[in-house]
């Protein structure tokens, strides 16, 4: 998360002239800006600054500590991919844990899978949940599913108390590795995730941008290869309002039944029963699933070198 969020006056001044500019030490020397039509909400939780504004081109925008988390226009590219890449890679997922994801978008997508019987979500910041329900009802609709059980608290602590082998899938929808999300990128956390997964279980975690964060990605890949004895893969998608316009995901499986992440065996786009309550998929399909694992050469060299 952005250090600027700790200086409230500096942060607010960045949106007063009519433009919001996202500035962070994680992407030095550049900024992405959106025109602000109206500021809808400003608050400070126990963990971070929370802002919602109406933009002129991307609809409503949720910002945490100065960093865009989602916009109404392009949230589908992130929420659908971080959810369906893992869940469409295993047969009949039944128990799913979401770490983070307080806006409810991942819940919305998990709830499309009829095989799922239990959806636990652990989000540390209740303000994010409340604000999302108020301003992003089409995203937060996931909370309305009766299979969802909300745990407000620290995801790291929650995982430590989960019985071994509980979940078929864990989805880690974290913000950037600064502030409250820092621990979600570290080795002990991945060890807890692996322990919570059943044999052949899968995890998908937000894994930064290949254009900006190859040093972070390299560390994540190295840690995951030590911990997850099944498969370790990196995929990516395009999200226009994220830094560099792309965001990546680590997809890993535990030892057990083999998981071929690149070839979905549980295609959600072949089943339209979920569209009545959740609407049609806007971004994900089986073709883009497989294509998301194709990496540019510079990233492929770094990621594959960790396999040796």
Swiss-Prot record:
Q: In which pathway does it act?
A: Amine and polyamine biosynthesis; spermidine biosynthesis; spermidine from putrescine: step 1/1
**Catalytic reaction equation(s):** S-adenosyl 3-(methylsulfanyl)propylamine + putrescine = S-methyl-5'-thioadenosine + spermidine + H(+)
What's one GO-annotated cellular component? Answer: cytosol
What residues does S-adenosyl 3-(methylsulfanyl)propylamine bind to?
48, 79, 103, 123, 154-155, 173
What processes does the entry annotate via GO biological process terms?
Answer: spermidine biosynthetic process
What Enzyme Commission number(s) appear in the record?
2.5.1.16
Residues recorded as binding putrescine, renumbered to this chain, are 78, 173-176, 242
For whether the record's keyword set contains Transferase, the answer is yes
- Record: active site: 173 (proton acceptor)
Top-level enzyme category: transferase
Q: What range(s) does the PABS domain occupy?
A: 17-254
Q: Name one GO molecular function term.
A: spermidine synthase activity
InterPro entries (alphabetical): PABS, PABS_CS, SAM-dependent_MTases_sf, Spermi_synthase, Spermi_synthase_euk, Spermidine_synt_N, Spermidine_synt_N_sf
UniProt keyword list: Polyamine biosynthesis, Spermidine biosynthesis, Transferase
Sequence similarity: Belongs to the spermidine/spermine synthase family.
Q: Which PANTHER family match?
A: SPERMIDINE SYNTHASE, SPERMIDINE/SPERMINE SYNTHASE
This protein's name? Spermidine synthase 2
**The organism of origin for this protein:** Hyoscyamus niger (Black henbane)
């Amino acid at each position: 998360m952005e250090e600027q969020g700790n200086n409230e006056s500096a942060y607010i001044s960045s949106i007063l002239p009519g433009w919001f500019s996202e500035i962070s030490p994680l992407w030095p020397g550049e900024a992405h800006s959106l025109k602000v039509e109206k500021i809808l909400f400003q608050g400070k939780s126990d963990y971070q600054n929370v802002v919602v504004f109406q933009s002129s081109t991307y609809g409503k925008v949720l910002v945490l500590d100065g960093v865009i988390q989602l916009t109404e226009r392009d949230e589908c590219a992130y929420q659908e991919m971080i959810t369906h890449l893992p869940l469409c890679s295993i047969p009949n997922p039944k128990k799913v844990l979401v770490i983070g994801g307080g806006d409810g978008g991942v819940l919305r997508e998990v709830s499309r899978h009829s095989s799922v019987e239990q959806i636990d979500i652990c989000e540390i910041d209740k303000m994010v949940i409340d604000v999302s329900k108020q301003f992003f009802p089409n995203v937060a609709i996931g909370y309305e599913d009766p299979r969802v059980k909300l745990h407000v608290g620290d995801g790291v602590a929650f995982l430590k108390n989960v019985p071994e082998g509980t979940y078929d899938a864990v989805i880690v929808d974290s913000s950037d590795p600064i502030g409250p999300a820092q621990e979600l990128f570290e080795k002990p956390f991945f060890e807890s995730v692996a322990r919570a997964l059943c044999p052949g279980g899968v995890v998908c975690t937000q894994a930064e941008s290949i254009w900006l964060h190859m040093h972070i990605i390299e560390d994540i890949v190295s840690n995951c290869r030590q911990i997850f004895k099944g498969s370790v893969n990196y995929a990516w998608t395009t999200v226009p309002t994220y830094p560099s316009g792309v965001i990546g995901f680590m997809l890993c499986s535990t030892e057990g039944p083999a998981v071929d992440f690149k070839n979905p065996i549980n295609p959600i786009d072949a089943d339209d029963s979920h569209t009545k309550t959740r609407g049609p998929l806007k971004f994900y399909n089986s073709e883009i699933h497989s294509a998301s694992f194709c990496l540019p050469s510079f990233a492929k060299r770094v990621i594959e070198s960790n396999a040796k």
